[in-house]
Every structure is written in C-alpha cells, then in structure tokens.
Amino acid sequence: MCGLEKMIFLKEGIVKVSSILEDGREYNITYAKGPNLLSLMCDTLREDVAYRIRIRVESEEASFCLVSREDFSRVVKQDEKLKEYVEAYYRENLQRALYRQKCMTMNGKSGAIYAFLYNLISLFGKENEEGILIDMQVTNDDIAGFCGVSTRNSVNRILRGLREENVIRIVDNKILILNADYLKPYAD
C-alpha cells in the first residue's frame, strides 16, 4: 500500500504499520491513529529496497486520502507552517524509534513487553474502576512483532507471569492493566 508515487494520509481510524522483511517475516513499526501521514514513514524507500511497508486497518473503519507525492512536495516547499509540521513529524518519529530501540535493548524481552504495554495506555487506554483497559485487541503475534520477540509463545509466557503477579488481566480478548506502576519503570 505504500507506493512511491503517492502519499497516504490516514484521516480517521487505527492502523498498524509494519515492514515485510526479505524472508517474509513482519516487523511491526507502529500503531497509528488518524489523522496521520503514513507515507512519510516510507519516504526514503526506493524501488531496489529489499523490504515493503504494510498498512493494516486495526479499527472497524478507517479512511484514507491519497495525494501525489510530487504535489505534496510542492505544497510543503511553498508553505512554511506545513514544512515545519513535516519536519516535526520526522523528528517525533525518529525519537519514538530511538525510544523503542532503547526499550528493546536495555530491558530484555520482558522489559520490552512491559514498556510496550505501558505505551499502549496512551494510545488506547480507557480507565475504569479496575484499572486501564487497552480498548483494542492486540494479539501475542503483534506484541512479538513490536518487541523483537521471536515467538508468540515467549510473549504468552511473559504475559502469564504478569497475570500471576496481578499486573494485567485479559477481559474479552483485551488487556486490562491492573497495575500500571509496575510497568512504568520499563517505559521511562
């Protein structure tokens, strides 16, 4: 979906952006909520690059807008505020990528998953009387793909440990975080 000739704008909805590696494995990059500029994540791709970007709709509905890359570039060059926005977008995405890399390398598998769960709070968290419900179904495969964990079985084992410690509970296939303070140090 991420062609070189078009810019993809997510107007509304939630998508998962992933990279399909040469060997067919999927590496999850981010969840994105609209409005968002999805194509800027793959702006540096060339035709000879050995991986592709996949954009998968995660919400019940999502709407997109396609704009010619050439037209977008021309408008950005002419509009200083838009240029500043695009530059800030790149900086924020770079900071998020560096943060995620830090979480994965400094915390090990468990810590990477703890940080990921904590970060889901700001994206999809809804407080209730028991804790914070991650109001989206996130599979063990998705968590593995975001955290650099090789199998969903490893994710299952780590989540089981969190359930036994009363940090999380699964409610209608969604994660209910009972103790966000337990996860927070891994996300700082």
Region spans (language model):
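Conserved short histidine dyad/triad with adjacent acidic residue
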Residues: 1-2, 21, 32-36
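Regulatory nucleotide-sensing modules
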Residues: 1-12
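Structural motif
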Residues: 14, 36, 61-63, 142, ...
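Cytochrome P450 core scaffold surrounding the K-helix E-X-X-R motif
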Residues: 17-24
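Cyclic-nucleotide recognition modules
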Residues: 28-91, 95
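Polybasic "coupling" helices that flank or enter modular domains
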Residues: 81-147
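Phosphate-/nucleic-acid-contacting segments
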Residues: 123-188
